């Protein structure tokens, strides 16, 4: 392992994992480990499917960190937004056409740069169920707009769309529409599976891995000097791109198989990195 200069952590099921809840908060153990990491001059950052300010806004206002948000659709570095993907209205129209066949029940929505949600049909049963949030899931949006997505894109004054999400009632819907999108658009869009039942659609090849690479390039850090930790499907791209990858031990076996190391917590990952960094420095001094 190279000397690690930066660690990117997923949120749900990773940094925010306090058993048995995947999204509970930053444990005292993890918070103390982050401080140790930073004291050793290793940057701690976030790579998440959530918005860039979800962590500080929802859980801890002190944790304003470099963030690859929305699975790579938006990036914040040193407190500044440095990148956001941007769908033109005609591109949204084409996506709506793909999802118009009603082959599988779904909830299709788009996200604006202000983190407002725009549903394909805001009056649909799926949209109403999302608003009710019976499961108590910690949601991440500023407002749910009353306009339909088709109405929203007709107004040129509205901000362009950052990314699109689609959640299906059955897993078969994911495979069906992923195939449809790839055949229709010939890899024009990045389609990232975020769970067995959902996908996010983005432009410019955006994903967690490419977002991390953008930050690394700006900071002058090599990919071999970065570590990543996650637990779900939307971490596959960063596991593939970053050699020093860690997966949470509660993740499914097929997800764990994508990573190099398996750990129980972010704190365990950090301790491993600090130990390896210490060993690397001793080797450089020819003391090992």
Q: What is the predicted role of each segment?
A:
Residues 55-58, 181, 255:
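Hydrophobic packing residues within well-ordered alpha-helices of enzyme cores
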Residues 2-6, 15-17, 27, 199-288:
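Mg2+-dependent phosphoryl-transfer enzymes with acidic/Ser/Thr/Gly-rich catalytic loops
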Residues 3-8, 29-42, 181-185:
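A short, Lys/Arg-enriched amphipathic alpha-helix followed by its capping loop at the start of a domain
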Residues 107, 112-229:
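Conserved acidic, metal-coordinating active-site core of Asp-based
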Residues 28-132:
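Active-site phosphate-binding/coordination module
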Residues 4, 41, 64, 161-162, ...:
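Short, well-ordered alpha-helix to beta-strand connector turns
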Residues 62-63, 71, 185-187, 241-242, ...:
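Short, structured coil segments at secondary-structure junctions
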